[in-house]
Amino acid sequence: MKDQEIRSILFDSKGYIWVGTYVALYRCSSDFSSCKRYDSSLPVTSVNSIYEDADKNIWVTFWRKGIFRYDRIKDTFVKYPALGKENNPFSVFQDDKKQHWIGTWGEGLYKFYPEESDEQVYMPVESVKEGELPENGTFFSIQQDKKYGYLWLVSSRGLYVVRKRVDNLVETIDISDISSKLNNIFSEICLDKSGNLWIASFNEGVAYINLDKPIIQNYPMPSIKKTTGLTTNIQAIYNDNDGDIWINQNRLGLGIYKKDSNKIIWYRD
């Protein structure tokens, strides 16, 4: 894994740490003393995302190579049908009703039905009001808040929030009061154990949203700019069961962000 840029991180329910890089997928022990690289059943390309759903299924998406499910018994991966024209699913999410969603690179948002036959596996999602949700959009990350049950979509065009419906339509929510206080160039969103949203950005560290207060706060992480001389460029963010925020920075790699002290403990330390 050394010298490989990290694209996605997952701490699974069995205690393993999954790491996706630009060229491979790894499963590591909790202390990183051992790591296994998966090659035989997976394409050699960039890992877009790694996700574990409520049924403990682990889903991995690959750049232009589709979506795969991990088979724990065989310790291998199962490939799913191609999605859209480009077969480039970027993010996977399961909501509180166990509905799966897939955000693609350039082909919009889909509902995902893993148990259905080929033609029914993916269903494109559109907004009730035409054009409010881009059909050709790129969605990097998906999360659901605990207060309203809305889906939060991090895209190449900014942040979208939608209300689910029983059909393949969604209603977009006006969040101008939130987005006006945030940098609009985001990379990923996660939820902490208190129900707060954390959004990683390319230019300004991470943003924190507490919907109960409500509070919107930016954490610019000046130590990164001081060390690299460049913008923060947080490419991945993950909240573990201990409440720690794990980040991946373009130059410095993997680190744990401590909100209370505003400090980052880098993996190399």
Named regions from a protein language model:
Residues M1-D269:
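Carboxylate-rich, polar loop motifs that coordinate divalent cations or form catalytic acidic clusters
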